[in-house]
Amino acid sequence: MPLLQTFKNEVRIPENNDWVVFILIGCLFLYIFMMNVIEREANLKDFLLQKYYDSSNNLPSWMITSLVTALSLSVLVSQYIPIIPKYIADFQPFGYQLNKIGYTLIIISLFYFIRTALAFLFYQAIGDGKKWSIFYFTSTKFHFILSVLLIILCVTHYYFPIDRNSAFIYYIYFFSFVFIFKVFFYLFHRNNILPQKWYYKFLYICTLQIAPLLMLWKLLFI
């Protein structure tokens, strides 16, 4: 009688990060579409260095860049959200409950939408509406580079053996540096995207940069 070979069924259950792959691949496809179709096969150097008056299709490029930034940022920070507020968790349309990535994406998307709407109204209110299109054209370049860095951080965070608890403090340093750099980038950019008068610049930085970030922090982490 032949010996029966016994196999030990060891099932390894890895952390399921397939959703991260799908989101990041979607972000990359959006950028490929933007560069090849919207920007008419522009290379990276031409896209980043193009001048406003030589550009076209700025609005769709800005929308895609904002979407990718919101998605990649949500993927990165969602794992640090302590809890979903009860009034959000209790809202279950069609029996589905919002998870942390969904909650984070909604909050960050609302953050971008409301801040953009307020920035538009700000430029119109001070009589500087012509600068609005130059503003979001310049902002697109900044957020494009930021989103690429966020995608790299997402890959590192989910697919490399790092201490995620310790990494959180480094993310805070990173985003603090990004914020400070962004303020100076807007202040001293050659396109002069901020209002000329200093008190309007101060008002913009306080009300449309600092205050919204504090509210975003409160909604996500407090």
PLM feature segments, named:
Residues 38-43, 73-89, 118:
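Membrane-helix interface motif
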Residues 14-31, 95-111, 165-174:
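Alpha-helical transmembrane segments
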Residues 1-62, 86:
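N-terminal juxtamembrane cytosolic/stromal segments of multi-pass membrane proteins
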Residues 87-158:
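Alpha-helical transmembrane segments with an aromatic anchor "belt"
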Residues 38-52, 121-131, 188-192:
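Cytoplasmic membrane-interface regions of multi-pass membrane proteins
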Residues 56, 60, 64, 93, ...:
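Hydrophobic, aromatic-rich alpha-helical transmembrane segments
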